[in-house]
Amino acid sequence: MGYIKIKMKFWSQQPVFHIYNLLYWLNPSGIINKEMPVINKYTNIIDIKSYGISEIKDTLLERLCHFIKIYYIQSSNTTYSPTKTNIIEYLKCCNHESYLTLYEKNKLLFEKGQVTNSISTDIVSVITARSMNITFKNKPAFTLYYVDNLCVHPDYRKHGIAQQMIETHYYNLRKNNKKIQVCLFKREGELNAIVPLVAYKTTGYNIKNVSLFNTSSSSSFSQNQQYLNVIEIGSSQLSLLLDFVYSQKHNFECIIMPDVSNIINMIKTENIYIYGVINGTYLSAVYVFRKPNLYYEREEALECIMSIDGFTNNDNNDNNDNNCNNSQNNNNSFIAGFNISLNKIKEKLKTTILLVENTSNNNKIKYYLNKLFITQKNDILFESPTAFFLYNYVSYSIPSEKLLILY
């Protein structure tokens, strides 16, 4: 424990579920600090300012988006290339104000070698937050802030800027909106000494030369794909999605969803794409894709962030002699629906890289794809450890297939 506190000094002082906290293991009591956070050595209210999405000037938004595009991901084989729409529209149309927090540094302007009286600012770091709704099984729902886009200029990394950004961002969020006390963070790569809400693998597949849609290879898939009706769900069909999620909520231990107005905005701005298998007037399966604006070796990626298998989930509640056969057929229907959906969006966006986050019923999709890639002797691109963790809230970890999150 002493080693962890020394090595991770900042996080050891944060209101999170540390792995060494025996009290939290015995009693995961929910919200940690209900009172306003106090200013400490990590709080920098001089250089760091928070702006509501409704009040920030467009010129500053342009600079902020350019900063994220240039510095958020730096890798020899990976390029992050979002537009302003890909960053800002996620923050709009929420029931609570979204916030953008910036660390800016003043610089003097020079004209013909002489210092002028004018002062401009350089962006050192950026972080954002938008409200989402979380529901644990058999507990009342509450609202949290999803913290995203933490980015520090390369010249200022390893200087404690990220810690100041997180601390000050949270301080300003609590100050500006006293109704929201909890935050959600996503972490990619190796995990630290925080007990995550959920930990899973994100898997990358190159689907450019893979026969994902060869229905002749499986008679059951072929038969299923012939009768399945897959639609793209727009804002006018969103009630179908909401009704379906409600009908399937008993299959998940934790559900995290944006406000309905935010989902509609993400659909309209083509940041997310939702497909569903429709049977008459109701859905039997749903697949949610997102544009991560990532390019691997110059090939654009597409991300499957959520899916719900209403075929098998409903079948698991049945108790009859044909249950095993029904489950297999229904699982084939779920995978067939995924194939059709992926084919549609692959043709629409011309993407060749597929990322699958192993939450919700994506475990079934991942199992199918892994098996398919082995059969066709194709290599999986990578598997990356990923996790969500709660800030100022204690909860046991849940299995990844029991988390339903649309973000």
Predicted segments, located by residue:
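N-acyltransferase acceptor-side catalytic subdomain
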Residues: Q14-N21, W25-P28, I32, I56, ...
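Conserved acetyl-CoA-binding loop-helix of GNAT-fold acetyltransferases
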Residues: V152, K158-Y171, N329-I345
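Active-site/acyl-donor-binding loops of N-acyltransferases
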Residues: Q181-L228, V286-N316, N329, N339-Y407
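Acidic, Ala/Val/Gly-enriched low-complexity intrinsically disordered segments
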Residues: D318-D321
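Conserved N-terminal entry element of GNAT/NAT acetyltransferase domains
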Residues: G2-L61, V210-S235
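A conserved beta-strand-loop-helix scaffold within acyl/acetyltransferase catalytic domains
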Residues: D47-P154, R187-E188, E232-N314
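Classical protein tyrosine phosphatase
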Residues: T168-V182
